[in-house]
């Protein structure tokens, strides 16, 4: 019996240590802690531009502009890149593409003026950080009829955040706001669309349980 008590105590200490080390950032802004949901989920808002953000949040006008400008800079680094305008337009539609400006963060061989094309930033995701301030990520959308990103907000990794409607709020994994790796190589026509389609499939297979649990 004494030995059994010792084993139980050891098990209790093990579980207590695991609990003590669990992340404490479970309530950032309006985060909902739901059974079965990721512990790092948080609320974000999606806007097409800083004006939409400022109208929805008059007291945060400066933060809206700062986040928008930062998202634009991030878009240049992380957006999918194409070797020609035609390849970009095929995926995103007319008036949706621009030449990639040369910048220090990209490989030297990729900095030739006009050598690559990228989609224009269609909006941005904005969320409050635990340490104060706001974090952001650029969002893109497609006007191409056959694109899985048509009329949707997607990030540089192809993750879909629903209709490209400004002013929406939603709960996302904190990883959605994490910095994305710079894109310095071009992709083939249709490559980004395939990525979006795969992300959509993953989302449909994993999001339903999260939505139903906890109401």
From Swiss-Prot:
Record InterPro entries: Biofilm_formation_YgiB
Coiled coil stretches, renumbered: none
Lineage, highest ranks first: Bacteria, Pseudomonadati, Pseudomonadota, Gammaproteobacteria, Enterobacterales
Family in the record: Belongs to the UPF0441 family.
Covalent S-S links between cysteines: none
Name of this protein: UPF0441 protein SG0265
Gene source species: Sodalis glossinidius (strain morsitans)
């Amino acid at each position: 019996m004494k030995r059994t008590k010792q084993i139980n105590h050891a098990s209790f200490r093990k579980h207590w240590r695991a609990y003590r080390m669990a992340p404490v950032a479970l309530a950032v802004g309006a985060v909902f802690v739901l059974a079965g949901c990721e512990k790092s989920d948080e609320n974000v808002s999606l806007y097409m531009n800083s004006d939409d953000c400022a109208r929805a949040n008059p007291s945060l006008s400066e933060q809206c502009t700062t986040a928008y400008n930062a998202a634009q800079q991030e878009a240049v680094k992380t957006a999918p890149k194409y070797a020609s305008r035609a390849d970009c337009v095929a995926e995103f539609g007319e008036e949706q593409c621009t030449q990639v400006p040369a910048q220090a963060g990209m490989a030297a061989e990729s900095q030739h003026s006009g050598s690559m094309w990228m989609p224009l930033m269609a909006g941005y995701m904005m969320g409050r950080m635990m340490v104060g301030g706001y974090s952001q990520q650029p969002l893109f959308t497609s006007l191409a009829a056959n694109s899985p990103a048509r009329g949707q907000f997607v990030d540089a990794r192809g993750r879909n955040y629903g209709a490209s409607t400004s002013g929406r709020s939603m709960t996302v994994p904190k990883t959605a706001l994490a910095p994305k790796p710079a894109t310095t190589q071009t992709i083939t026509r249709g490559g980004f669309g395939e990525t979006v389609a795969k992300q959509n499939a993953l989302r449909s297979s994993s999001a339903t349980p999260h939505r139903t649990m906890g109401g």
